[in-house]
From Swiss-Prot:
Annotated InterPro entries: HMG_box_dom_sf, Maelstrom, Protein_maelstrom
Organism annotation: Drosophila persimilis (Fruit fly)
Protein name: Protein maelstrom 2
Family: Belongs to the maelstrom family.
Pfam family, one: Maelstrom
Region (Disordered), start-end ranges: 374-438
Length: 438
């Protein structure tokens, strides 16, 4: 039922009840009975203000909409605003990355353009709020031509853990980086000093930029909230001006995709088949995940190099080199574009010229050595021919195996038919040492 509209008479009744001490103990019906003769004796000029007040109240009630809430009691309108702001910020970030790559491409400096990759490890996350307690930080400068030119790595000792979350921090550390918890943690204890050092290192190659331009760093989408929160955590204790240059965290996956498209364009190679899903799938494979010698000494010793931030940022640089340097004919330098020591994930066994390539499965064709691929290229790799070659090469090892050819319907084993025929005894090839028990 729609709510009743206010009228001038009821507005007058409410005012009479508020201003008349006699009316304080009366009910609404009794107050209406008292005010009815007074209202009838009033003229239009006296009733005018009350009618106007009632009209204004009705207009305000219609315009004022009740705020919708979700199941957790949060405002739906505020959630929509936050969602739209996040979408707008992501779109602006992607446009900024594309402008950076386009500017470097137009100035013929694409291979010399430097990017900064950063990563944080953390002890724990606050239950309420986007707050991460930092544990380790690493960064590196990378370009296609020079590879990894320099890197920065440090462990962090914040001095304490969020109250009541020691158990969560212990579980997270045990399953990931295995760094000792504060106050026994390693590294710098002065958060303000550490932030100034990190900021100065990130800004050292940006002299040509204006002071108000932000410092742009790149990390994975999963680590973006961690990196942003850890930078805020360190900056909260640093003595910096509000107008100081800020650190902006961008998506390295979009950089990987945009840079690959531009590299192929510069190399004169068609890039129609390159899309975000292709480049993202290549990046997340993380081919250098278990490479030795690229993490810090602590994680190398305890065999946790996969979770070391120093290893992360270097692996990202190696992935960029592995995917793009060949398109621009850039030679790979060990330690800069690829690890110093690379262990192959396959073993090539020398074979004679009489190697039976028909016994190689179709799945192993693309992982076979180039010599084998070349010789296999002239062969028929259709499923039918492959099946025939495998059947010819197969030699049964079990002497009790059924040796029928199964070429005719009579020899095919019956599956519950009425006329069940047993195969001839000659089809069973029993070994000399085997006898049938009677």
């Amino acid at each position: 039922m729609a709510p009743k509209k206010r009228n001038g008479f009821m507005t007058f009744v409410k005012e009479w009840q508020a201003n008349n001490p006699v009316a304080r103990g009366l009910s609404n019906s009794e107050a209406v009975a008292k005010c009815d003769p007074i209202w009838k004796s009033m003229g239009d000029q006296e009733r005018g203000p009350y009618n106007s007040m009632a009209k204004n109240a009705n207009v305000l009630e219609r315009t004022a909409k009740k705020e919708r809430l979700n199941c957790l009691g949060g405002s739906v309108a505020e959630m929509e605003i936050e969602k739209n702001e996040a979408i707008s910020a992501e779109l602006q970030m992607k446009r900024k990355i594309e402008r950076i790559i386009l500017t470097a491409k137009n100035s013929m400096e694409l291979e010399n353009e430097e990017f900064v990759f950063v990563s944080f490890n953390y002890f724990t996350k606050a239950l309420t709020g986007d707050i991460y307690v930092p544990a380790e930080f690493s960064a590196c400068r990378y370009s296609l031509k020079g590879g990894i030119s320099s890197n920065y790595s440090t462990m962090i000792n914040p001095g304490h853990i969020i109250y009541g979350q020691s158990r969560d921090a212990q579980d997270h550390s045990k399953t990931t980086h295995k760094l000792p918890l504060p106050p026994q943690a390693f590294g710098e204890t002065n958060m303000g000093k550490l932030y100034i050092d990190i900021f100065n290192w990130l800004s050292v190659r940006n002299e040509e930029k204006l002071d108000q331009d932000p410092v742009i760093v790149y990390t994975t989408p999963e680590l973006m909230p961690v990196v942003k929160s850890c930078f805020r955590y360190l900056a909260s204790e640093a003595e910096i001006d509000e107008d100081e240059r800020k650190i902006m965290v961008f998506d390295i996956h979009h950089l990987f995709y945009t840079l690959k498209k531009s590299v192929l364009d510069v190399a004169g190679v068609t890039n129609d088949r390159i899309n975000f899903h292709v480049t993202n799938n290549f990046f997340v494979k993380d081919f250098f995940e278990y490479t030795e010698g690229i993490s810090c000494d602590y994680h190398e010793k305890i065999d946790r190099s996969k979770y070391c931030t120093n290893s992360m940022v270097k692996r990202w640089g190696f992935t960029f080199s592995d995917y793009m340097c060949a398109d621009l004919a850039i030679p790979l330098q060990p330690g800069k574009h690829i690890p110093l020591k690379v262990k192959p994930n396959y073993t090539i066994t020398p074979a004679s010229s009489s190697t039976n390539f028909d016994e190689i499965s179709l799945d192993s064709y693309y992982s076979a050595p180039p010599r084998i691929q070349k010789e296999m290229g002239s062969r028929d790799l259709s499923p039918s021919s492959s099946h025939q070659s495998v059947s010819r090469a197969y030699v049964p090892r079990d002497h009790s195996v059924y040796g029928g050819t199964l070429d005719s319907d009579e020899e095919f084993p019956s599956l519950g038919g009425r006329r069940r025929q047993l195969p001839d005894k000659s089809h069973f090839n029993m070994g000399a040492g085997k006898k049938i028990a009677r």
